Every structure is written in structure tokens, then in C-alpha cells.
């Protein structure tokens, strides 16, 4: 049934993972306040800061695989949402989606670690909303799986009573 509570959580997974593609995941400013490095789902970009060079792109590296994984996770959540008649399949799809989101989170952390070592190893960058959207999506996925499992156990217990 579409009106179940896990539907809301699966929809929130899709929204959170799609927001990752539009939001900044990580950023860091060097100690001289002359450059800023930003990680999005599509690029790792170094910008110039200061007078006259504000916003000029100094270097850009494509990390499109984070964006692709985020879109795949959102699509899988929406597909899982449509599989409400087959709870076992829905739990399996959510398990696969958790794996994809975990890989996305791992790649994002790895990219931030690598960028931090190159850009400014003495200071840590700041994780932005895009990073926390991945974490929120994982939590929403776990909660939705819990409610799906609860429904499955309820159906099995009713079958036992018959």
C-alpha cells in the first residue's frame, strides 16, 4: 500500500540523494585565505579568493561518479517505493540501496581526505549539507526497512493465526 509510513521514508531517501547532486559536499579554505576548494557531486574545484580574482576557477577535477551513484540510489529508492506489494523484494532493494549509499559516502570521504592532503594538510575542511544528506538518506533507508520488516512480520503472524 502506498499510504504506509515506509513510503514516506523511501521518498525522503530519494529527495536526500537527489539533493546531494545539487549541494556542496565539502569545502576548505587555505590558511592564506587566497584559495577555496569545494567538492560537489560532480566536481572537485579550486577557486581563487581575494580582490580581483574572486570566484576564478584555478583547477577542476571531475568526480562525476558521486553524482551518478546518488542518482542511482534515488532511482532505486523510487523503484523500491513502487514495489509495495512484494515486501521481500522491497527489503532486498533497500539493502542494495544501502550498499550504494555507503559506497557514495565512502567515495566522498576518500575524495575529501585526498583533497585535504593536497590542498592543506594542516587544517581540516568542513563537511557541508550534501555530505549530511547522504547520511540522512542512509538513516531514512534503515528506518524504512525496519517498517517493511515490521509489516512482513505482522502478515506472517496473521497467516499463522488462520
Locate predicted features.
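N-terminal membrane topogenic signal
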Residues: 1-9
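Hydrophobic H-region at the start of alpha-helical membrane spans
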Residues: 8-12, 69-71, 95, 99, ...
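Hydrophobic alpha-helical membrane-insertion segments
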Residues: 11-25, 96-105
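Interfacial loop at the N-terminal end of multi-pass membrane proteins
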Residues: 14-68
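Hydrophobic alpha-helical transmembrane segments
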Residues: 63-80
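Juxtamembrane helix-break-helix junctions at the cytosolic face
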Residues: 78-91
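Membrane-helix boundary/juxtamembrane motif in polytopic membrane proteins
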Residues: 88-99, 158-161
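Alpha-helical transmembrane segments of multi-pass integral membrane proteins
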Residues: 103-162
Amino acid at each position: 500500500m502506498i499510504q504506509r509510513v515506509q513510503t514516506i521514508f523511501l521518498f525522503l531517501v530519494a529527495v536526500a540523494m537527489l539533493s546531494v547532486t545539487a549541494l556542496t559536499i565539502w569545502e576548505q579554505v587555505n590558511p592564506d585565505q587566497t584559495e577555496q576548494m569545494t567538492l560537489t557531486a560532480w566536481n572537485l574545484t579550486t577557486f581563487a579568493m581575494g580582490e580581483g580574482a574572486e570566484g576564478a576557477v584555478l583547477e577542476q577535477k571531475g568526480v562525476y561518479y558521486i553524482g551518478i551513484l546518488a542518482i542511482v540510489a534515488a532511482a532505486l529508492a523510487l523503484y523500491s517505493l513502487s514495489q509495495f506489494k512484494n515486501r521481500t523484494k522491497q527489503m532486498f532493494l533497500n539493502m542494495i540501496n544501502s550498499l550504494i549509499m555507503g559506497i557514495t559516502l565512502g567515495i566522498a570521504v576518500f575524495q575529501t581526505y585526498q583533497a585535504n592532503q593536497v590542498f592543506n594538510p594542516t587544517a581540516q575542511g568542513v563537511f557541508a549539507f550534501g555530505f549530511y544528506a547522504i547520511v540522512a538518506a542512509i538513516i531514512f533507508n534503515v528506518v524504512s526497512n525496519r517498517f517493511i520488516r515490521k509489516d512482513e512480520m505482522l502478515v506472517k503472524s496473521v497467516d499463522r493465526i488462520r
